[in-house]
């Protein structure tokens, strides 16, 4: 860790008796964002054994994350509660980060944290995989069902029907990848 957790988060984590997983469930484009229902399945399984911190930004994401945290055990939203520097301190103390193809995964990787990344219509071979991460932690959409992936570098362009490609990554696979990274 580069720094310790801010005091207010330590209280929520109740002494750090379990590994802490960061989850950043949003991305700039919906084609790179796992559905709420699948993410809830992942969180439901992981919160049984681990503490989970939710990351995001902006009013809409912050509200969604707070709602998700309130409906789960061992799940806390840090969105909108800390300045960026303190959020980075929190990320630097995680055991693993689960992220979409988005900035939070890159920030965690730069801080030396293991990152499990979900890829929808983008692909890590396009050059944007988080730094120094195991390729096995890049969870990809089904390339047989969606053979045109990657459809774009940023995920903003995709053929009709590809917007749900990320949903071919099953929640059980995500949970196992996170557990294997601990």
Annotate the PLM regions.
Residues 12-14, 44, 129-130:
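Short secondary-structure boundary/capping segments
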Residues 21, 52-53, 75, 139, ...:
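Hydrophobic beta-strand residues in large extracellular and virion-surface proteins
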Residues 1-32:
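Mid-sequence helix-capping/hinge segment at a functional interface
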Residues 6, 83-87, 143-149:
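A short acidic, often aromatic-flanked loop/helix-cap motif at beta-alpha or helix-coil junctions
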Residues 32-35, 166-167:
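Aromatic-acidic/polar surface patches that form glycan- and anion
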Residues 36-121:
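Donor-binding and catalytic core of enzymes assembling or modifying cell-surface/extracellular glycoconjugates
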Residues 20-23, 67, 150-157:
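Short, basic/glycine-rich phosphate-binding loops at helix/coil junctions
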Residues 78, 109-182:
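Nucleotide-sugar donor-binding patch of glycosyltransferase catalytic domains
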């Amino acid at each position: 860790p580069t720094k310790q957790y801010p005091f207010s988060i330590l209280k929520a984590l109740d002494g750090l008796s379990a590994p802490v997983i960061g989850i950043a469930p949003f991305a700039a484009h919906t084609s790179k964002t796992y559905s709420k229902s699948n993410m809830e399945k992942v969180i439901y399984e992981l919160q049984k054994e681990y503490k989970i911190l939710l990351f995001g930004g902006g009013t809409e994401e912050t509200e969604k994350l707070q709602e998700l945290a309130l409906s789960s055990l061992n799940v806390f939203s840090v969105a909108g509660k800390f300045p960026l520097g303190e959020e980075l301190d929190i990320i630097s103390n995680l055991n693993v980060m689960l992220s979409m193809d988005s900035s939070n995964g890159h920030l965690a990787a730069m801080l030396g944290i293991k990152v499990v990344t979900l890829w929808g219509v983008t692909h890590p071979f396009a050059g944007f995989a988080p730094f120094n991460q195991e390729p096995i932690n890049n969870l990809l959409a089904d390339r047989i069902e969606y053979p045109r992936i990657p459809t774009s570098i940023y995920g903003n362009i995709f053929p009709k029907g590809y917007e749900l490609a990320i949903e071919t990554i099953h929640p059980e696979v995500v949970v196992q990848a996170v557990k294997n990274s601990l």
